[in-house]
């Protein structure tokens, strides 16, 4: 990020992380929203180029944010780790470069004292995303329908074109 933001981000990050190290767990990211369209295109390109592998990605193997809460379990997975798994272990360079332009600052609680949940720093890119699935429980059916009907990312990132693969 531009140098004028670094001190602000560093100070804010420190206060936020210090608080959540003692009150649960936390992640924080600064995103250049002007880059989101480029990120959607990069994700779309990877998803559509690797759609035959979509069913092979086991979300149980991915870093999941909020998994300690039944309200949020299954809703947000680390984007970079998902793309790496989808591509057989290595994310394409153009995707990685776009992610770096989009997510300009990240942080997480390294050792929260009051939570059993830990962020895996090796699999934390600062950007999570919902991964639609074929689960038929009411919770997932509701969220898949909401994702399809109300969130622009569904169409922008290529999920709409792959529904016949992951859908139910």
Feature roles, as predicted:
Residues 1-168:
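Terminal, contiguous helix-loop blocks that mediate binding/assembly
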């Amino acid at each position: 990020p531009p140098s004028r933001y670094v001190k602000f981000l560093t100070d804010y990050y420190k206060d936020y992380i210090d608080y959540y190290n003692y009150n649960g767990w936390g992640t924080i990211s600064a995103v250049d929203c002007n880059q989101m369209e480029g990120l959607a295109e990069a994700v779309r390109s990877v998803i559509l180029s690797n759609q035959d592998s979509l069913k092979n990605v086991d979300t149980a193997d991915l870093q999941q944010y909020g998994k300690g809460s039944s309200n949020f379990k299954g809703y947000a997975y680390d984007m970079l780790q998902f793309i790496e798994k989808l591509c057989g272990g290595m994310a394409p360079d153009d995707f990685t470069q776009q992610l770096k332009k989009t997510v300009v600052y990240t942080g997480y609680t390294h050792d929260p004292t009051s939570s059993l949940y830990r962020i895996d720093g090796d699999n934390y890119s600062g950007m999570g995303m919902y991964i639609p699935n074929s689960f038929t429980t009411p919770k997932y059916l509701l969220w898949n329908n909401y994702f399809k009907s109300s969130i622009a990312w569904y169409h922008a990132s290529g999920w709409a074109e792959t529904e016949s693969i992951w859908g139910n």
